[in-house]
Amino acid sequence: MVRQKNRYLLCEIIYIDGRRLHRNLQQRDIYHCVRNALAKEHGEYGVALALRSLSIQAYFHPNIVMIRVSRDAHKMLQSALFFIRKIGQYEAFFNTLHISGTIRTCQKFYVGYLRRELPKLLRECKTPEEEKEVKKAISSCVPVEVT
């Protein structure tokens, strides 16, 4: 059996209104947004090529998602992500932070990114609940899947 080669894109969701903290955004909203962008930019061919292995995993850090896609389709996915301006009901866009061939190197980059970014997020907390959530993330510094 031949190993399927994938690419992993670590992306940050940036909201137009400038807010950085968690929104009630579901993984299915992100998935449908990405799928629709692929269909719009690359048609049925792009969707069919990408959907073989398209998977989206949202992490505890409010605005980070990891997208898995086949190696053949990752450039199509990158170009489609550029045109996304609305995710679910929010005006937002994707900023690609890292592209990797393995999930392990992508997660290593993510842990380093968390160590740099979470202290900044702690300064922006407005409620004690938000502060407690961010402190918990800083102490663990491990990605957790959102369901």
Predicted segments — roles?
Residues 10-12, 66-68, 95-97:
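Beta-strand cores of modular interaction/reader domains in eukaryotic scaffold and signaling proteins
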Residues 59-66:
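The conserved glycine-aromatic submotif of the RRM
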Residues 68-75:
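Helix N-cap motif at beta-to-alpha junctions
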Residues 78-81:
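Short active-site loop/helix that positions an aromatic residue
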